[in-house]
Curated annotation (Swiss-Prot):
PROSITE patterns: DAGK (PS50146)
Protein known as: Sphingosine kinase 1
Organism of this sequence: Caenorhabditis elegans
Annotated ranges, domain DAGKc: 83-233
Entry-linked Gene3D superfamilies: 2.60.200.40, Probable inorganic polyphosphate/atp-NAD kinase, domain 1 (3.40.50.10330)
Keywords: ATP-binding, Cell membrane, Cell projection, Kinase, Lipid metabolism, Membrane, Mitochondrion, Nucleotide-binding, Sphingolipid metabolism, Synapse, Transferase
Functional pathway: Lipid metabolism; sphingolipid metabolism
Length: 473
């Protein structure tokens, strides 16, 4: 008996040591980056004079700092209307990421927009669904050239689903481009867009390029595919990811370290979850992707050449200068039909074509489906994904296939090097629709980085798209 106990202990110590070795260099490197960032900002210059106000960012509490920054931002003088090159609706989440979004706007984004003669209306969000409610009810969206978001993917998700509640949602989606300045822990949409144009995937390069595009009068936008999502009690528009199991838990359970570690929180929690690995019983159903003649194409346009309303008007006008009744009816009913795939080429899970449907009921370690290449700056999760393409890149890991916990650690670290899909225990397939049914409790269902309260989630590709700031002329 003693020998058995000793053997078990030695095996446990061996795999724990292996996990620690695998993660140690990565964690040390990321924590070194955090310390260097903290050191670079620790010396107080006390005051910065900007936009008619004085900003001190290190000698008072976060609440006092946010209050003063908000006051300075809202009291700015916009460029004269006759000189204006464009107009943006700006949403700032003061609590996203490490909590520096207000400072970023006051000291960097605002001055650059002023210099470019771009006017802006600022909304500083005060809590969940603030941006959603603004975009759901705002009557003058048409006057803006675009929306600029200082936060992470979560606020983009909230904004899109606010627009989804409007009667003119499917006119607004492609004609109101969204710009992003990374201020949250997760910036998958931005990284996916920038990587297409060769931006290096590190924090400094992503921020610099995002700032350049967001504040440039020659900014261009292009199409990003939109997906239909249905849960137990609500429907959503989605653009990025659906997760359940390991990676969803890492994302949500590390939220408590958001301000102290930033996006490095994922690495630390990844180590913890690899040591304390869980399995989850669920049923996964999916339809393999078949294009069937549908070839998505990207619509690239200048952000400031026209307002949103002008782009909407252009989309209505046909060669004879009128809009057909059938077209208007189609646009009005798209909102009602959003719970179904808006495509003749794809079918919802559970349709009559059962021979093409795959069903897996088992114990899962991880289910993660993405529609874009990146979920963060570390490396592409789905290297073959394209912005405008309407296929879903589904990957999953079964408990019976993983072997040891060390393999999970290798999987998480392999994402950064684009080799995770080559691991033998990782299954991946391109699908047009999928359905997840949660059988056992214990994990979060995460949609575009946000927790959704549901035991069933259905996702389907559509022909709809949004537009996102992507480049400069």
């Amino acid at each position: 008996m003693f020998i058995v106990v000793v053997t078990i202990f030695e095996n446990y110590t061996q795999w724990y040591s292996s996990l620690l070795t695998i993660f140690s260099l990565t964690i040390k490197r990321k924590l070194k980056t955090i310390r260097s960032m903290q050191d670079s900002t620790s010396k107080c210059t006390c005051t910065e004079h900007h936009m008619g106000g004085t900003i001190c960012c290190c000698c008072r509490s976060d609440a006092e700092e946010n209050e003063q920054l908000t006051s300075v931002i809202l009291s700015r003088k916009p460029p004269p209307q006759e000189q204006c090159r464009g107009n943006l609706l700006v949403f700032i989440n003061p609590n996203s990421g490490t909590g520096k979004s207000l400072e970023t706007f006051a000291n960097t984004v605002g001055p650059k927009l002023d210099k470019s003669l771009i006017r802006y209306e600022v909304v500083v969000t005060t809590g969940p669904n603030h941006a959603r409610n603004v975009l759901m009810t705002k009557a003058d969206l048409g006057k803006f050239n675009g929306v600029l978001i200082l936060s992470g993917d979560g606020l983009v998700f909230e904004a899109l689903n606010g627009i989804l509640c409007r009667e003119d949602a499917f006119r607004i989606f492609p004609t109101l481009p969204i710009g992003i300045v990374p201020s949250g822990s997760g910036n998958g949409l931005l990284c996916s867009v920038l990587s297409k144009y060769g931006t290096k995937m590190n924090e400094k390069s992503v921020m610099e390029r995002a700032l350049e595009i967001a504040t440039s009068p020659t900014a261009k936008a292009e199409s990003v595919a939109l997906y239909s999502v249905k849960t137990d009690n609500q429907s959503y528009a989605s653009f990025l990811s659906i997760g359940w199991g390991l990676m969803a838990d890492i994302d949500i359970d590390s939220e408590k370290w958001r301000k102290s570690l930033g996006h490095h929180r994922f690495t630390v929690m990844g180590f913890i979850r690899s040591c304390n690995l869980r399995s989850y019983k669920g049923r996964l159903t999916y339809r393999p992707y078949k294009p069937k003649g549908f070839h998505p194409s990207s619509n690239v346009f200048s952000v400031y050449e026209k307002t949103t309303q002008q782009r909407i008007d252009d989309s209505k006008v046909k060669t004879n200068g009128s809009v057909s009744d059938s077209e208007e009816e189609t646009m009005e009913t798209k909102f009602q039909n959003w719970t179904l795939p808006d495509s003749d080429e794809t079918l919802a899970v559970g349709s009559s074509d059962l021979e093409e449907t795959v069903v897996i009921e088992d114990n899962f370690v991880n289910i993660y489906a993405v529609t874009l290449s990146h979920i963060a700056a570390d490396g592409p999760f789905a290297p073959s994904a394209k912005l405008e393409d309407n296929r879903i890149h589904l990957s999953y890991i079964l408990w019976k296939d993983i072997g040891t916990r060390v393999n999970i650690a290798k999987y998480l670290l392999a994402i950064e090097h684009e080799t995770h899909l080559d691991l033998p225990f990782v299954k991946h397939v391109e699908v047009s629709s999928m359905k997840l049914e949660v059988i056992s409790e214990g994990s979060h269902v995460v949609l575009d980085g946000e927790v959704v309260d549901t035991k069933t989630i259905e996702v389907a590709s559509t022909k709809n798209h949004i537009s996102v700031f992507s480049s400069t002329a």
